[in-house]
């Protein structure tokens, strides 16, 4: 990808991995699609194994003006949003369970009970925060680099967007 090559060139010129990403809040492919850059070719690798090369503006139209239930993450991965995946379903359940544990902590009468429920909700918080990191581990049954990258970069884009509107 353009992004992989760009980051690799920065690292080879002496930048650290973190410095190579300085001021880049989404993949170069994502930015090209969202800006509908003319002349920028994007390769789409489909789930069935085939590939298509399209102009960034055409990818934008395909995703946002087409009839498919698709959304584009900040790393350029196209996801379907008409069905809930295993990982989002699991996160939704854990989040709901954490909210219940936080409510029990709030309702607790003694310091010991508050500490107990606080530790229980903290375990859920750690589970929630760790899942996408685990998905980036090649030893994980659900290993998929795209999902971990999508979460990280999309979170960055959202934070940047919110910062621009708040500040």
Task: Please give the residue ranges for each predicted region.
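Conserved acidic
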Residues: 1-167
């Amino acid at each position: 990808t353009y992004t992989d090559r760009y980051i690799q060139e920065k690292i080879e010129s002496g930048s650290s991995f973190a410095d190579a990403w300085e001021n880049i809040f989404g993949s170069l492919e994502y930015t090209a699609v969202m800006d509908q850059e003319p002349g920028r070719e994007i390769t789409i690798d489909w789930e069935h194994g085939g590939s298509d090369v399209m102009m960034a503006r055409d990818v934008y139209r395909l995703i946002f003006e087409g009839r498919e239930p698709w959304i584009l993450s900040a790393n350029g991965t196209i996801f379907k949003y008409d069905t809930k995946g295993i990982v989002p379903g699991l996160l939704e359940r854990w989040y709901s369970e954490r909210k219940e544990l936080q409510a029990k902590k709030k309702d607790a009468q003694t310091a010991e009970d508050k500490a107990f429920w606080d530790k229980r909700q903290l375990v859920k918080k750690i589970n929630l925060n760790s899942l996408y990191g685990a998905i980036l581990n090649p030893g994980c049954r659900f290993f998929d680099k795209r999902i971990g990258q999508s979460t990280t970069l999309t979170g960055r884009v959202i934070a940047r967007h919110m910062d621009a509107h708040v500040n």
